[in-house]
């Protein structure tokens, strides 16, 4: 193995030219602090890049010692045989329909002479050892010009749900291999503006509102995003989930769906064979698209229930993908919907995945001290060709430090050489809540430790289940001839109790060496709330946003990694990091059958409070300023019990009974002071001296009137509310 050592660029001769450029300071993880949005107008944004933490690493090549440059957030996407010249990328929200252009407003640079920049090894797979791949000088080293040429470019536009975006790329290092001159741009200011020409990958229909649940994602992805550009949809932070289930498991999914509704996520079931028979990937993709495009239905999560032979992954050359089902708007690789899978070959396989998910969200207490403990696993390989020029061990050390700063109380490090399966088994059985793995892999095992599917039966971590960010080859290839590594961990149980993991993101193909490291970095940074504008609380939200950062920086290779990095488990899983604390929740013990709202007091802002009736959601609200006011979307019957459920990040879940009292529809069934009739798609309501209101299934008011109302409805479920003679009645109406 070649020895690499860092050599910090000399700045003595350049000190008067740097203009504030920061060299050789310990780089804070995350985004380059020297990249700023200078201005954002309707049709133009200005962005300033300034060099940060430029360093050089010496490597041995066929031409002698050459240098590999790195700087904060710089990414090497150079083609094999061309000079290694990292770029930095930022995403901007742009016009929905116009083509964009980038212009350099100003720039400053210095030059370093007699420099030999090493050639790129290209995209390296984690099926290979980077140290065994030689540096090969390509034809570009004979060309008397600066590479890559332009210091600022635009990538193809992409669409993220309601917003069209475009990535601006800075190439601050320009190298002439004939004269051996390295031009270092210390500052670049660009303007990205609209043109009069029609653009590519446009948004054809601009909504007059945007789903609130993606606001933080927009703010994180786009430098210039402003929430005021749209009117947020009211009270829709949690969105909606559809469970697409193979027919043979339809009767086994009820407990999961009931719990999801109970904890505040509106969840529906669709039998896969009712979409198409036989079930095809194209049919699944089209169904998800149709559900996403339904007006007012904020589809956010899709959970596939079944193995590949039940609900197939989308297969294209070199790709086996569930994630593409969530890529709906435009022709890019940014998901609008978070996708996950309970991969199962038996009812027992499914039951343990349901049980572990419900227990994790519902039953964790202050006695679960295993939370806040993490495991970091790394190979002994990597280095200059990897993300940030890090070896796998350096990469995992950075993650370990981040977790410690956040509050994790114990970090177990299993680094090669010498890691054994027993090291991993002992770590799991001792209690851990998070695993980060970076190394080699196979369909059935981790390369570091050789812990694999044959060792899973030795796990005894009953309901002390970590989630896993896995950077490795084919650990998630659920099309393999036997259960893959990720499937084995999700199906594991001991004496009927779940063991293994509660969720894992793992690849169906050989992963690239560098780009998933950037995705894994971002996942951990989001988990540890490093980015205030990108706070995510679900496994799907954390992992997908981590991959967005990877795609932004690694372009086509990042897209391929995103498409094949598969979520095994519930994408809406509310993740836990530290030992939970208790919430103080107070609410009335009773509710009137005619009530329209229900108020809950809670000392944790951001908690989700939900009233449900035997797995049917009655209403839900977010705790703000110490209270949640739940609007009741469904009729409730007298002398029954509702369930109040309050969930919060790193909190003990609170569940209380609420008794229904007072006048209900059932009490006046034979003497109703109103009539409700449905004919085709027409709802007719009549009642003297009454206020009439119709709500759709999401609780949105769609019609109001006095005394008489005729409403033309779409297919769906509606609540008709009649207020008359001091009483309020609610009836559920189904339009087919």
Curated annotation (Swiss-Prot):
Look up keyword Metal-binding and say if it applies: yes
UniProt-annotated binding residues for Ca(2+) 4:
522, 525, 531
GO BP terms: namely: proteolysis
Q: What is the lineage of its organism?
A: Bacteria, Pseudomonadati, Bacteroidota, Bacteroidia, Bacteroidales
Q: Tell me which residues bind Ca(2+) 2.
A: 329, 332, 334, 336
Entry's InterPro entries? Caspase-like_dom_sf, Gingipain, Gingipain_N, Gingipain_N_sf, Gingipain_propep_sf, Ig-like_fold, Ig_E-set, M60_C
Q: Where does Ca(2+) 1 bind?
A: 307, 478, 487
Residue numbers binding Ca(2+) 5: 613, 639
Chief location category:
secreted
Excised during maturation, the propeptide residues are 25-229
Residues binding Ca(2+) 3 are 390, 395, 521
What's the encoding gene here? Answer: rgpB
Q: Tell me which UniProt keywords the record has, alphabetically.
A: Calcium, Hydrolase, Metal-binding, Protease, Secreted, Signal, Thiol protease, Virulence, Zymogen
Q: Name one GO molecular function term.
A: cysteine-type endopeptidase activity
Name of the protein this chain belongs to: Gingipain R2
Enzyme Commission code: 3.4.22.37
> Which reactions is this enzyme annotated as catalysing?
Hydrolysis of proteins and small molecule substrates, with a preference for Arg in P1
What protein family does this chain belong to?
Answer: Belongs to the peptidase C25 family.
**Where found?**
Secreted
Q: Which organism is it from?
A: Porphyromonas gingivalis (strain ATCC 33277 / DSM 20709 / CIP 103683 / JCM 12257 / NCTC 11834 / 2561)
Q: Where is the active site?
A: 440 (proton donor), 473 (nucleophile)
The record's Pfam families line, in alphabetical order, gives: Peptidase_C25, Peptidase_C25_C, Peptidase_M60_C, Propeptide_C25
Q: Name one GO cellular component term.
A: extracellular region
Function text? Thiol protease. Acts synergistically with RgpA to catalyze the maturation of fimbrial subunits, such as FimA. Its proteolytic activity is a major factor in both periodontal tissue destruction and in evasion of host defense mechanisms.
Signal sequence interval, chain numbering: 1-24
């Amino acid at each position: 193995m070649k020895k690499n050592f860092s050599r910090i660029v000399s700045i003595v001769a350049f000190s008067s030219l740097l203009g504030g450029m920061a060299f050789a300071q310990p780089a804070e993880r995350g985004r380059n602090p020297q990249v700023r949005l200078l201005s954002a107008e309707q049709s133009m944004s200005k962005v300033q890049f300034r060099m940060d933490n430029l360093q050089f690493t010496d490597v041995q090549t066929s031409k002698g010692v050459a240098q590999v440059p790195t700087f904060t957030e710089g990414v090497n996407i150079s083609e094999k045989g061309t000079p290694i010249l990292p770029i930095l990328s930022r995403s901007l929200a742009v016009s929905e329909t116009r083509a964009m252009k980038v212009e350099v407003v100003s720039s400053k640079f210095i030059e370093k002479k007699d420099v030999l920049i090493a050639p790129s090894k290209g995209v390296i797979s984690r099926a290979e050892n980077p140290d065994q791949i030689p540096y090969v000088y390509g034809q570009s080293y004979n060309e008397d010009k600066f590479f890559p040429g332009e210091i600022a470019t635009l990538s193809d536009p992409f669409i993220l749900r309601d917003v069209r975006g475009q990535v601006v790329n800075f190439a601050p290092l320009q190298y002439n291999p004939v004269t051996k001159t390295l031009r270092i741009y210390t500052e670049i200011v660009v303007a990205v503006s609209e043109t009069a020409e029609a653009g590519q990958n446009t948004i054809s229909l601009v909504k007059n509102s945007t789903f609130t649940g993606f606001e933080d994602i927009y703010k994180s992805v786009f430098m210039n995003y402003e929430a005021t550009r749209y009117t947020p949809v009211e009270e829709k932070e949690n969105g909606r989930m559809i469970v697409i289930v193979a027919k043979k498991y339809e009767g086994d999914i009820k407990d999961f769906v009931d719990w999801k509704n109970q904890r505040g996520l509106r969840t529906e079931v669709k039998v896969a064979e009712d979409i198409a028979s036989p079930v095809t990937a194209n049919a699944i993709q089209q169904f998800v698209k149709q559900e996403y495009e339904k007006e007012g239905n904020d589809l956010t999560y899709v959970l596939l229930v079944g193995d590949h032979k039940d609900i197939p992954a989308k297969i294209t050359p070199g790709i086996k993908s569930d994630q593409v089902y969530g890529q709906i708007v435009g022709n890019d690789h940014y998901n609008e919907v978070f996708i996950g899978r309970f991969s199962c070959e038996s009812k027992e396989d499914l039951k343990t995945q349901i049980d572990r998910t419900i227990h994790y969200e519902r039953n964790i207490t202050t006695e679960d001290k295993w939370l806040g403990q993490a495991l970091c696993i790394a190979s002994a390989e990597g280095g200059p060709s990897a993300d940030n020029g890090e070896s796998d061990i350096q990469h995992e050390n950075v993650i370990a430090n981040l977790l410690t700063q956040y509050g994790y109380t114990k970090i177990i490090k299993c680094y090669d050489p010498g890691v054994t399966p027993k090291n991993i088994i002992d770590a799991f059985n001792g209690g851990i809540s998070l695993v980060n793995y970076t190394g080699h892999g196979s369909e059935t095992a981790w390369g570091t430790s050789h812990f694999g599917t044959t060792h899973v039966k030795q796990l005894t971590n009953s309901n002390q289940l970590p989630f896993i960010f896995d950077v490795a080859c084919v650990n998630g290839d659920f099309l393999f001839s036997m259960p893959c590594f990720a499937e084995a961990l999700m199906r594991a149980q001991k004496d009927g109790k779940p063991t293994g993991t509660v969720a894992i993101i793992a690849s169906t193909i050989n992963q690239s060496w560098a780009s998933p490291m950037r995705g894994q970095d971002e996942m951990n940074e989001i988990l540890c709330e490093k980015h205030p504008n990108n706070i995510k609380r679900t496994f799907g939200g954390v992992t997908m946003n981590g991959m967005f950062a990877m795609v932004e920086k690694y372009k086509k290779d990042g897209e391929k990694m995103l498409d094949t990095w598969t979520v095994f488990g519930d994408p809406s899983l509310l993740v836990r990091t530290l030992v939970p604390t208790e919430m103080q929740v107070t609410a009335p013990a009773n509710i009137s059958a005619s009530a329209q709202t229900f108020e809950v007091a809670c000392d944790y802002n951001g908690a989700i409070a939900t009233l449900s009736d035997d797995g049917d959601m009655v209403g839900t609200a977010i705790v703000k300023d110490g209270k949640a006011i739940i609007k009741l979307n469904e009729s409730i019957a007298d002398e029954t019990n509702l369930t109040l459920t309050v969930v919060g990040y790193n909190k003990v879940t609170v569940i209380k009974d609420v008794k229904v009292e007072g006048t209900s529809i059932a009490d006046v069934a034979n003497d109703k002071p109103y009539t409700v009739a449905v004919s085709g798609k027409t709802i007719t309501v009549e009642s003297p001296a009454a206020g009439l209101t119709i709500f759709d299934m999401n609780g949105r008011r769609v019609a109001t009137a006095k005394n008489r109302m005729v409403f033309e409805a779409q297919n769906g479920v509606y609540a008709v509310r009649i207020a008359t003679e001091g009483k309020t009645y609610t009836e559920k109406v189904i339009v087919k």
